[in-house]
Amino acid sequence: MRALALIFCMALVAGCGKSQRMCAVCDRGECKGMAFRVTLENGKVVETCCPRCALHYLETNHQQARKMEATDFATGNWVDATRAVYVSDSDVHPCATLETRQDPQGCCMMKTYDRCLPSLVAFAAKDEATVFQKGHGGQIVGFQEIPRK
């Protein structure tokens, strides 16, 4: 009986890592309410932790997207990324590590670069984005207006 319980626990733990979706760009786990999915012209689906990583993927790999879907931060549902409303550079950044390090002289702390910053949070409705922005700052933009780099 004890051996059976041990095998069950090992199988449970082994399955946990496989269910976690990993970002195709930064290798982080999927961020709650931030995931982004790109279907390329060749049919390949690329999943990223956030919209910022998806844009980075498309720009650096010179790929054309047939379809793009963002997670609506308010509901967790998939929405057409080109029709979503985004809040850029808010104080909410679930994907970023926000590490700080000392400068070469060892005295001052500085933020390290993080590909997921500035944050980019997607919403299906502008009113939800406005409520979010009032509480967390940032700029409301459409897909075509997203600041690139």
Report each predicted region and the residues it spans.
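C-terminal motif of bacterial Sec signal peptides marking the signal peptidase cleavage site
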Residues: V13-G15
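Short functional micro-motifs and their immediate structural scaffolds
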Residues: C31-K32
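Bacterial signal peptide processing site
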Residues: G17-S19
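Short metal-binding segments enriched for Cys and/or His
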Residues: R52-M68
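Positively charged n-region of N-terminal signal peptides that target proteins for export
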Residues: M1-L4
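Beta-edge loop/turn motif
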Residues: K44-A54
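Beta-strand-rich cores of mature extracytoplasmic or soluble domains
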Residues: N77-R148
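Short cysteine-rich clusters marking metal-coordination/redox-active sites
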Residues: C23-C26
